[in-house]
């Protein structure tokens, strides 16, 4: 079986070119028949959903308390400004989160280039993007929170996070990939025909080039597939652990932690029913849970600490077989 796998053709990068503003075309060939669509679909989905990037997640504008306000002397209303901020293309090169300021006196246009980094290592990729227009001599100051993340994050998923006074949460598209499409053409190597050639077109926000993006996507897929390479059959005679092999505290339902209704419902929605399930989750795992924010996370950590337990605890052979069957 291993020997036959080595006989498969391995594709090579035969072309990488820029076809437009932040648009790239990559061609890989030859691939075994059918692998063009198999790998093309996998890479496309991974590129669109799993690339790391930065985005504006919160803004506080001096004198503005909510998104339905208007600002005297400013052409755009606050909702339009928020929409413009969602299109800001930046990258935090070192920090996970950072606060930056834009402060201008009109009349003028406020663009991404007006962001004051104040020593923060940040790169802007659409500096000419207009955020707001001041029509008179009015003064405008806004504080932006920029965060690093993966995929798409709605403002409602961060309702538990502490906001600055007057801070307005934004839906954030962290992905540096705007669009991915692919086609599969016929290829040939010597006398071997019916092979595939994979043509991938990628449009980015300018923060990453196509080759780097594909490499990152391939690494993600490789890491996910590595578990399948190392699959081992469980011997039938091997005794599976039962509840008697675990600390009774781990077998208790999360309801016994007496968490707030919000926190408890978030855990149940993620099928976290037992304390043993919960303590194996890391802080990052829980923060990715919809509607579970920092406040709920701190509550969970405090309750677990009172019981001498901590998050990110590995439990070998969990869950017990009789617990799974309940």
Curated annotation (Swiss-Prot):
Which GO BP terms sit in this record?
Answer: DNA-templated transcription
Q: What is its EC number?
A: 2.7.7.6
According to the UniProt record, where is the region Alpha N-terminal domain (alpha-NTD)?
A: 1-232
Q: Where is this region: Alpha C-terminal domain (alpha-CTD)?
A: 246-326
Return the InterPro entries for the record.
DNA-dir_RNA_pol_insert (IPR011262), DNA-dir_RNA_pol_RpoA/D/Rpb3 (IPR011263), DNA-dir_RpoA (IPR011773), RBP11-like (IPR036603), RNAP_asu_C (IPR011260), RNApol_insert_sf (IPR036643)
Q: Which SUPFAM superfamilies match?
A: C-terminal domain of RNA polymerase alpha subunit, Insert subdomain of RNA polymerase alpha subunit, RBP11-like subunits of RNA polymerase
Gene3D superfamilies documented for this protein: 5' to 3' exonuclease, C-terminal subdomain, DNA-directed RNA polymerase, insert domain, RNA polymerase, RBP11-like subunit
* Molecular function GO labels: DNA binding; DNA-directed RNA polymerase activity; protein dimerization activity
Q: Which UniProt keywords apply?
A: DNA-directed RNA polymerase, Nucleotidyltransferase, Transcription, Transferase
**Top-level division of the source organism's lineage:** Bacteria
Describe its partners and assembly state.
Homodimer. The RNAP catalytic core consists of 2 alpha, 1 beta, 1 beta' and 1 omega subunit. When a sigma factor is associated with the core the holoenzyme is formed, which can initiate transcription.
**Name recorded for this polypeptide:** DNA-directed RNA polymerase subunit alpha
Source organism: Ruthia magnifica subsp. Calyptogena magnifica
Gene from which the chain derives: rpoA
